[in-house]
Amino acid sequence: MMPRHTEVLSWSRVEDPSTSLGTGPSTPLGASPSTPLRASWIELELHRPPCNEIGSATLDALEQFVEYVGGQHAWARAIIVRSSIPAGFCAGADLRELHERMRHVAAGDRAASVRTFLERIHRVLAAFDASPLATIAAVHGVTFGGGFEVALACDLIVADRTARFAFPELRLGLIPGFGGIPRLKRSVGQHVVQDLLLTGRSINASRALELGLVSQVAAPGEALALARDVARQIAKLDSTAVAAAKQFVKPRAPLSDEERRAEIDLFCTLCERPAVEAALEKFVASSSLQPYLP
């Protein structure tokens, strides 16, 4: 597989030459039964400064990635989602783009524009849930809002000690809109969800590990190496059994259609308020990353 590169993200095949998978029921179609197989996975790298904000360009590329991954089940065993941006994994939705959309779209059409975006990102993250491949988020630094929601759509989160997690959307008069709350509810108790949502406070990697949000914590800068170790271990297992176990443990649809519609409806309703427009205006006027930090 040749690497694919866009301005906002890229993906490539990673093969561990030191690991032989042998042969057997997991042998990919077209592979010779006598040829030792190597542990292989796909790495999706986010690289949009300042902190991988998810706007139209990133969403377009994510949709391309999901379409691509659907044809790679024969050889891939896992997907690692990572960031090359020093500030962190992902700061969430591109609020500047949202602000521009609200400025240039007629008031009565704003909800429809936002709704289309949300429905598309929901489909992308639902594909992560439904994929037979194990998905691993390797996170560091800022993992806020929509970035937190992307990580929650993965089967495992591996974080380094610099990682911080938060849902700061209520500070803007909004709610998380990428399905993160239902996904969080399947991992932790209701009181934890309410605390993170209603206070907007951030938690560090150690606290996330205690709560069960994170599976492992690495030294600063080592999350990707640890995630690769996990992918290497998963790649040694029978792929059919891995997919079956994932489907059994993790619901394919953490959001019912009713929940998804209710979340999107509420987000769009809140988006129409003057208070949200004012909050976005204030955010855009800042040239600092400080608004990301609760």
Across the structure, where does each feature detected by a protein language model lie?
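Glycine-rich beta-to-alpha active-site loop
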Residues: 120-172
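Well-ordered beta-strand positions
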Residues: 156, 195, 199-201, 207, ...
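Conserved CoA-thioester-binding segment of acyl-CoA-metabolizing enzymes
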Residues: 1-21, 25-27, 31-84, 126
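Terminal low-complexity tails and localization/encapsulation signals of metabolic enzymes
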Residues: 1-9, 280-294
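C-terminal long alpha-helix characteristic of the crotonase
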Residues: 158-163, 214-262, 269, 291-294
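Short helix- or helix-capping micro-motifs
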Residues: 91-93, 184, 192-201
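Glycine- (often His-adjacent) and acidic-residue-rich active-site loop
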Residues: 83-123, 143
